[in-house]
Amino acid sequence: MREIVHIQGGQCGNQIGAKFWEVVSDEHGIDPTGTALGDSDLQLERINVYFNEATGSRYVPRAILMDLEPGTMDSVRSGPYGQIFRPDNFVFGQTGAGNNWAKGHYTEGAELIDSVLDVVRKEAESCDCLQGFQVCHSLGGGTGSGMGTLLISKIREEYPDRMMLTFSVVPSPKVSDTVVEPYNATLSVHQLVENADECMVLDNEALYDICFRTLKLTTPTFGDLNHLISAVMSGITCCLRFPGQLNADLRKLAVNLIPFPRLHFFMVGFTPLTSRGSQQYRALTVPELTQQMWDAKNMMCAADPRHGRYLTASALFRGRMSTKEVDEQMLNVQNKNSSYFVEWIPNNVKSSVCDIPPKGLKMSATFIGNSTAIQEMFKRVSEQFTAMFRRKAFLHWYTGEGMDEMEFTEAESNMNDLVSEYQQYQDASAEEEGEFGEEEEEN
């Protein structure tokens, strides 16, 4: 089967990951001890995408949990599904990375990385036909960003032909958790551009907005935010895990969404988002799902798709619905808002339909868009980076761990190149074919 090995790193990654395993276990009818209590055969038919069956038909997540300090892991272990993980798959150090990318990537993280890779190998070997890896991490801290990107590049070396999907929480525009976020994020993006296949970009502020505006939660907790993220994570792979009429997998997604190899940073969204109290009063239709799905307020990262154009997009529907209706709605969106789609990629929306909806809903949809507007986010981080780097603020923490200023300059220019690539394709039109083709060859 098409297995996916899940890796979570750092505090943010571990908290998102823990929530994700609650959601997936629930979907497959697995209780916190790993016993199957489901009422349907479909839940177990392809459960081995995310779970390994151990002795006594216990299901164990194919999850690897890593951190440079034991704190978050202890709280995962004492959480609702803490006992379901394989104890050997908790890999942690004692020192912590202290929000320092260099510690995660070069010093502390580098010492721990071999033990993580051993666990990765063990998990990969127990797979029948490994499809790829999914990594949860944040780009603002030290472990998730520094050690996370180190692990991604090591896995890339060892499994060059497997998909590498990341769920990356980027620093938010208004709320900052650490002062050195712009440094950590820029250094991480520098790595992700080269080594990841698909990056789902998330950020806390956009998630907070969804909780406030749409879900009407007055004081959203990180648990609420992580729940939104895990809905998307489960939606992306539901086609692998449940039978459907139009299937998608990580590789099909990549082929349909990535027109140019470096432009693999996606906005994601999930529908229906309704406040907890009003859920049962709404019957959903495909047009309603579609409308909410393309809504800018629904995007889980702080970039506005209306400020750019979609290169490609993918809609993953779940539930019993007619594929004809799905296709009509998708076509409808493209025809009505044609200026928001680049005209040199015709029919650039891929859709897939999976028959089994998530718990408690009749139908749902997950949206993944490759929009040039994501450059807003990179621009924002880059400006903050430049402001600090110009004065060499906080740089001694990084050079003290053996980093070179050169590396910062490289990361900065790589990020700026990425922004201008997005801009170039946003401005490109189908008529300029001649000069456009020539530009490409020079690069």
From Swiss-Prot:
Keyword Isomerase on entry: no
Stored InterPro entries: Beta-tubulin_BS, Beta_tubulin, Tub_FtsZ_C, Tubulin, Tubulin/FtsZ-like_C, Tubulin/FtsZ_2-layer-sand-dom, Tubulin/FtsZ_GTPase_sf, Tubulin_C
Keywords: Cytoplasm, Cytoskeleton, GTP-binding, Magnesium, Metal-binding, Microtubule, Nucleotide-binding
One Gene Ontology cellular component annotation held by this UniProt entry: microtubule
Span list, region Disordered: 421-443
UniProt keyword Metal-binding, yes or no: yes
Positions that bind Mg(2+): E69
Essential cofactor(s): Mg(2+)
Compositionally biased region (Acidic residues): 429-443
Family membership noted in the UniProt record: Belongs to the tubulin family.
Subunit structure: Dimer of alpha and beta chains. A typical microtubule is a hollow water-filled tube with an outer diameter of 25 nm and an inner diameter of 15 nM. Alpha-beta heterodimers associate head-to-tail to form protofilaments running lengthwise along the microtubule wall with the beta-tubulin subunit facing the microtubule plus end conferring a structural polarity. Microtubules usually have 13 protofilaments but different protofilament numbers can be found in some organisms and specialized cells.
Function summary: Tubulin is the major constituent of microtubules, a cylinder consisting of laterally associated linear protofilaments composed of alpha- and beta-tubulin heterodimers. Microtubules grow by the addition of GTP-tubulin dimers to the microtubule end, where a stabilizing cap forms. Below the cap, tubulin dimers are in GDP-bound state, owing to GTPase activity of alpha-tubulin.
The protein's name in its UniProt record: Tubulin beta chain
